[in-house]
Amino acid sequence: MKLLKIARFYHTKNLPIQMRCKRLDFFEGSEKKLEVYVKDVDLRALGKEYWSGIVERCQAKILSSISNDYCDAYLLSESSLFVWKDSFTMITCGTTMLVNSVEAFLERFDRENISLLVYERKNEYRPQLQKTSFFDDVKRFEKFVDGKAYRFGNVDEHHLFLYEMNNPYEPEPTDNTFEVLMYDLQGEAKKIWSCPKATLEEIQTKTAVRNIIPGFQVDDFKFDPCGYSLNAINGPHYFTIHVTPEESGSYVSFETNFQPEKNDYSKILAGVLKVFQPRSFDTVLFAPRINYKILADGFTLRTAVQSSLASGFDVKYCHFSWPVESVQSAKLL
């Protein structure tokens, strides 16, 4: 993990959101994520109209929603939003500007209402198509809050940028988040997820995607011609999946706050990998204390970075890939 000095990147183009999975176009699956905890505010009481406005600020829309006694889960045109009474998690992909939504939220509430703010941004396949860089986003955050910026992983490999607000925070012992970010789908998974003719019902039947963690209420959507998103909730817990089956850069994300027995995430990871069959993947784990390993049969650990944040969380980022067993052919462009 490396603490970053804030710099500025300049882009030559600002392009509109790309059409999903169009052959002559490109859609960026790599995501941006915001997690905010508040005090003295009931976020669910703000209502769908408020959250719809927050979502629209980053150039996305709410497609559908499900709710229970603990959480409202909104499926978005670009990923997902989960709202609890005292926190929310928002994930967006494509060329969305999640920083716009952050600003809209922070403009309404006082700094004293914010207990925790953590922003993640995965390095993109085509960063030149983005309207801002991570460093641009941080400069805008710091108009409202003080914080630190980090990079988990080497700059010339898969890596994760992270920004956290400077504020002491004591997370609950069970406040864990586990992410799996997958690349280059293979085999039958590639055929199923990249098939334009596949219906939502066929995807549900041919894969176990809705039952990676059993017992959850599920809301899912199949994009045209391809692409898939899923939200699932059970009590205060959620898991979410987003599939961008680009020929030139397929990407799938899985995330959950469900805590397995003895913090054994290997079983959940095995189920995720069975459904999507990636050539390589990252894991990102947030927990009050991380003193255990996550194992993946058949994959080689290439990168492991762990650090403790001011917010009271340990963060561990790992990158896994297939072992190199043969020479590949060059890709004809």
What is the predicted role of each segment?
Residues K2-K85, E124-T132, D136, R140, ...:
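Short Lys/Arg-enriched alpha/beta "domain-start" segment
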Residues V38-D40, T92-G94, V180-D184, T256:
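Short, structured patches in soluble enzyme cores that scaffold and shape functional sites
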Residues Y125-K148, K293-F320, V324, K331:
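Short, low-order "capping/linker" segments at domain edges
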Residues Q186-Y238, P245-Y251, E255-Y265, L273:
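Conserved mixed alpha/beta catalytic, RNA-binding, or beta-rich assembly cores of soluble enzyme
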Residues L43-E49, M97-V102, A189-K190, K262-K267:
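Short, conserved charged micro-motifs
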Residues I17, K122-Q186, S194-C195, V209-G215, ...:
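Aromatic/basic-lined ligand-recognition segments
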Residues W84-F135:
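Hydrophobic, ordered structural segments
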Residues E112-K122, K262, S266-T303:
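Flexible helix-coil linker/hinge segments at domain or subdomain boundaries
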